[in-house]
C-alpha cells in the first residue's frame, strides 16, 4: 500500500512502547527501541517514545462580560502508564490557549486587571485538563488527578467571582449610559431580527419616558418583546401587537405616580388612548345621518338579499371552526358539527333580519349624542355597562341596558325599539318576551336616566367590545376601558378573546352557560378590570 520510504522509521512501534509484541510482518515503525530518538511529550522532557506536540503561540487574550470560549489541544495518543508520574503539569508554559471574545466597552476593559484574568484563565484550564483525564485508564486517572489537586486549590471558586463581577459591572454600566437592549436571536421567530430590535428599542424608550431606569426599561422591554414574539405566529401579528403595546404605554402613568394611587387613579391608567380606540373601530367624532340608498337588505343570518323580510330563513347560528379530520383540515359549524357546504342551515326562522354597520345609516335611525360635561347632583367616576340588542325593521336596536358600579346594579331597564320587532335574538340577548320591550322606556328617557346616575364626559365606561354597545346607545365617548383591548389577542387586531374565555382564564368562573345575561357580562367585565389593576400593582 505504501512505498518503502521509511517515513515512520524514527517513531517507535506503538506495540513495543506498551510492552506488547508487534504482529505485523512489515511494520512501518521502528523496532530499535534502545537506539530510537527520544521524543518528549508536551508535558515532560523525560518520557520516551511520545510524539512531540507543536506548541502554538498563545494569542493575546482579553476579558469582557460576554461569552468565554477556551480551546485546548487534546492529545489523542494514550500516555504510557510508567510516564504519568513524570508529567509536569505546568499549565501556563505547555498548553496553547485561545480566548475567542466579543467586542466590549472600553470601560470594562480598563477596569479588569491582568492578575484576575490570569486566575480566571487558570481555573478553566485546570477544569479542561481534569476533563481530559477521563480518557485514561482508571488507575492513571487517579494518579493524574492527585497531581491536579494543588493547582486547582490555589484558585478557589473563580467562576462565581467572574459571574458576580460581570453582573456588578453591567449594573454600573447600565446606570451610567443608555444601552439599547437587543433581543436574543431566534431563527424561528415570526419577525426578522432587525424588526425585533427596532420594536425593542421603541418599547425601551416608552418605559424610559415613564420614569424607569435604564436597567428597568431594558428588562421590561425585553420581557414584553419576548412575550409578544412567543405568542405571535406571523410578522403582521407581531408588528400590530407591538404597536398596541407601545400605544398603551404612552397613556400609562409615570412610575412615581403608581405608588399610593387611589382606585380611581389606577383605573385612569387603563383608559385607552384615542389612537387605540380608532385602531379598534371606535367612533369618537360627530356622525352626520345618511339614509340608505338601496332598499335591498342583506340577511345577517343566511346572507340572502331581500326587500320583504318574510322568510323562511335557514341558517347556522354557530361559527365555523377549522379542525383536522383524516389528515385533512376542514371547517365545521360549532352549532351542529356539519361540514361547511354540506347543509344550508340547522335553524329555520320566519323572517330575514339585517343590521346597519355604516355609522351614518345608524344615525339616520337615531342621532348620536355626547354625555354632558358635568351633572348638578352626584358624579359617577366609573361604571360597567352591557347592552342587549334585537332585530327590528330598522336593523339592530337596543333592547336592554344594564349599568353596574362596584359590582352592584344601579340601572337595569328594557328599551322600547322604534321599529317593528322581527326577532328577539334570544340565544344572545336572553330576552324571551316581546312584551318586556313594548313596556320599556324610550332612548330619550334612557339618556335622562343615565345623566341622573351621574354619568358625564369624565366617567370611565367599562365593558367588553364596548364599541358595539356605544353604537347601540348612540353615544360618543372617549374615556373607555375595554377588556377586549385590555387583554389583547395573541394575533392582534382585529382578533379578540371572548368575555367567556377571559373570565374563565383570569377569574376562574364560567359565564354564559345557557344564554347571555347583561348583568352577568357587566359584572364580569368590571371584575376583569379590577384584576388587571391588582396585577399591575404586583408587577410594580
UniProtKB/Swiss-Prot annotation:
<dbReference type="InterPro" id="IPR047021">
    <property type="entry name" value="REXO1/3/4-like"/>
</dbReference>
<dbReference type="GO" id="GO:0004527">
    <property type="term" value="F:exonuclease activity"/>
</dbReference>
<keyword id="KW-0862">Zinc</keyword>
<dbReference type="InterPro" id="IPR000571">
    <property type="entry name" value="Znf_CCCH"/>
</dbReference>
<protein>
    <recommendedName>
        <fullName>RNA exonuclease 3</fullName>
        <ecNumber>3.1.-.-</ecNumber>
    </recommendedName>
</protein>
<dbReference type="GO" id="GO:0005634">
    <property type="term" value="C:nucleus"/>
</dbReference>
<feature type="zinc finger region" description="C3H1-type">
    <location>
        <begin position="7"/>
        <end position="34"/>
    </location>
</feature>
<keyword id="KW-0378">Hydrolase</keyword>
<keyword id="KW-0963">Cytoplasm</keyword>
<comment type="function">
    <text>3' to 5' exoribonuclease required for proper 3' end maturation of MRP RNA and of the U5L snRNA.</text>
</comment>
<dbReference type="GO" id="GO:0034476">
    <property type="term" value="P:U5 snRNA 3'-end processing"/>
</dbReference>
<comment type="similarity">
    <text>Belongs to the REXO1/REXO3 family.</text>
</comment>
<keyword id="KW-0269">Exonuclease</keyword>
<dbReference type="GO" id="GO:0003676">
    <property type="term" value="F:nucleic acid binding"/>
</dbReference>
<dbReference type="InterPro" id="IPR034922">
    <property type="entry name" value="REX1-like_exo"/>
</dbReference>
<feature type="domain" description="Exonuclease">
    <location>
        <begin position="382"/>
        <end position="529"/>
    </location>
</feature>
<keyword id="KW-0863">Zinc-finger</keyword>
<dbReference type="InterPro" id="IPR013520">
    <property type="entry name" value="Exonuclease_RNaseT/DNA_pol3"/>
</dbReference>
<dbReference type="GO" id="GO:0031125">
    <property type="term" value="P:rRNA 3'-end processing"/>
</dbReference>
<keyword id="KW-0479">Metal-binding</keyword>
<dbReference type="GO" id="GO:0008270">
    <property type="term" value="F:zinc ion binding"/>
</dbReference>
<dbReference type="InterPro" id="IPR036397">
    <property type="entry name" value="RNaseH_sf"/>
</dbReference>
<dbReference type="GO" id="GO:0000467">
    <property type="term" value="P:exonucleolytic trimming to generate mature 3'-end of 5.8S rRNA from tricistronic rRNA transcript (SSU-rRNA, 5.8S rRNA, LSU-rRNA)"/>
</dbReference>
<dbReference type="GO" id="GO:0000175">
    <property type="term" value="F:3'-5'-RNA exonuclease activity"/>
</dbReference>
<keyword id="KW-0539">Nucleus</keyword>
<keyword id="KW-0698">rRNA processing</keyword>
<dbReference type="Pfam" id="PF00929">
    <property type="entry name" value="RNase_T"/>
</dbReference>
<dbReference type="GO" id="GO:0005737">
    <property type="term" value="C:cytoplasm"/>
</dbReference>
<keyword id="KW-0540">Nuclease</keyword>
<dbReference type="InterPro" id="IPR012337">
    <property type="entry name" value="RNaseH-like_sf"/>
</dbReference>
Amino acid at each position: 500500500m505504501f512505498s518503502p520510504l521509511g517515513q515512520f522509521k524514527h517513531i517507535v512501534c506503538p506495540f513495543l512502547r506498551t510492552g506488547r509484541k508487534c504482529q505485523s510482518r512489515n511494520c512501518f515503525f521502528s523496532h530499535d527501541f534502545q537506539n530510537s530518538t527520544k521524543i518528549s511529550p508536551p508535558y515532560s522532557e523525560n518520557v520516551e517514545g511520545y510524539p512531540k506536540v507543536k506548541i502554538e503561540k498563545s494569542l493575546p487574550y482579553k476579558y469582557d462580560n460576554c461569552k468565554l470560549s477556551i480551546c485546548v489541544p487534546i492529545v489523542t495518543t494514550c500516555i504510557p502508564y510508567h510516564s504519568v508520574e513524570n508529567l509536569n503539569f505546568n499549565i501556563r508554559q505547555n498548553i496553547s490557549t485561545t480566548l475567542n471574545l466579543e467586542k466590549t466597552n472600553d470601560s470594562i476593559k480598563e477596569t479588569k486587571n491582568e492578575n484576575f484574568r490570569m486566575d480566571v484563565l487558570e481555573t478553566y484550564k485546570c477544569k479542561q485538563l481534569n476533563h481530559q483525564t477521563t480518557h485514561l485508564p482508571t488507575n492513571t486517572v487517579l494518579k493524574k488527578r492527585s497531581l491536579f489537586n494543588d493547582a486547582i486549590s490555589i484558585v478557589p471558586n473563580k467562576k462565581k467571582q467572574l459571574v458576580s463581577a460581570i453582573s456588578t459591572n453591567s449594573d454600573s454600566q447600565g446606570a451610567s449610559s443608555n444601552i439599547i437592549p437587543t433581543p436574543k436571536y431566534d431563527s424561528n421567530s415570526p419577525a426578522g431580527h432587525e424588526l425585533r430590535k427596532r420594536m425593542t428599542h421603541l418599547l425601551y424608550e416608552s418605559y424610559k419616558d415613564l420614569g424607569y431606569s435604564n436597567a428597568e426599561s431594558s428588562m421590561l422591554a425585553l420581557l414584553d418583546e419576548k412575550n409578544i414574539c412567543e405568542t405571535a405566529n406571523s410578522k403582521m401579528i407581531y408588528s400590530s401587537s407591538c404597536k398596541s403595546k407601545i400605544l398603551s404605554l404612552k397613556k400609562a402613568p409615570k412610575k412615581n405616580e403608581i405608588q399610593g394611587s387611589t382606585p380611581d387613579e389606577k383605573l385612569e391608567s387603563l383608559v385607552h388612548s384615542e389612537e387605540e380606540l380608532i385602531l379598534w373601530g371606535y367612533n369618537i367624532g360627530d356622525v352626520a345621518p345618511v339614509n340608505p340608498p338601496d332598499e335591498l337588505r342583506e340577511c345577517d343570518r343566511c346572507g340572502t338579499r331581500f326587500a320583504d323580510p318574510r322568510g323562511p330563513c335557514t341558517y347556522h347560528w354557530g361559527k365555523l371552526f377549522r379542525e383536522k379530520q383524516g389528515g385533512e383540515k376542514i371547517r365545521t359549524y360549532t352549532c351542529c358539527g356539519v361540514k361547511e357546504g354540506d347543509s344550508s342551515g340547522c335553524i329555520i326562522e320566519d323572517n330575514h333580519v339585517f343590521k346597519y354597520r355604516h355609522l351614518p345609516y345608524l344615525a339616520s335611525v337615531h342621532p348620536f349624542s355626547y354625555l354632558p360635561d358635568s351633572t348638578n347632583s352626584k358624579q359617577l367616576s366609573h361604571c360597567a355597562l352591557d347592552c342587549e340588542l334585537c332585530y327590528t325593521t330598522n336593523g339592530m336596536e337596543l333592547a336592554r341596558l344594564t349599568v353596574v358600579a362596584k359590582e352592584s346594579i344601579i340601572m337595569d331597564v328594557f328599551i322600547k325599539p322604534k321599529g317593528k320587532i322581527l326577532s328577539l335574538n334570544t340565544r344572545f340577548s336572553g330576552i324571551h318576551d316581546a312584551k318586556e320591550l313594548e313596556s320599556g322606556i324610550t332612548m330619550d328617557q334612557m339618556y335622562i336616566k343615565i345623566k341622573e346616575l351621574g354619568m358625564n364626559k369624565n366617567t370611565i365606561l367599562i365593558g367588553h367590545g364596548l364599541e358595539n354597545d356605544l353604537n347601540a346607545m348612540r353615544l360618543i365617548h372617549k374615556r373607555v376601558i375595554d377588556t377586549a383591548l385590555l387583554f389583547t389577542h395573541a394575533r392582534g387586531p382585529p382578533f379578540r378573546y371572548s368575555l367567556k374565555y377571559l373570565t374563565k382564564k383570569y377569574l376562574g368562573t364560567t359565564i354564559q352557560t345557557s344564554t347571555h345575561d347583561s348583568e352577568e357580562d357587566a359584572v364580569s367585565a368590571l371584575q376583569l378590570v379590577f384584576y388587571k389593576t391588582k396585577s399591575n400593582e404586583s408587577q410594580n
